[in-house]
């Protein structure tokens, strides 16, 4: 992808819309099948959403996404945001970060989950910087503190 083809957005501070109770999941896929980590995250998002009167939204970026969207619905997504563009047919972290950041800034989800894969870690770090927001990495469990409106992340510790 050349620089004139990129979707460029300025760095903006991300602020959650307090009324928007949505939990988004970045849906990774390989060869027209959702990745296992995405299915796990959809399941976790579904349990968090059910406990907090929220909805689950899957974010699909790429090309030819219809079958993947149907699969995501069967694993607990209430809605799918598809960014279907021929320039996004193959994973390119800069292009995917541009597309995801635009969607996040527009929709303002309360939580955004990304799998701890090679591509997911790269994308998550870039989004955190672009959106000037926090990043909880390598979580083994997620809980909601509904009284304080906090997402609590459990991580393993050594030492």
Which residue ranges define each predicted feature?
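N-terminal glycine-rich FAD/FM-binding segment characteristic of electron-transfer flavoproteins
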Residues: 1-159
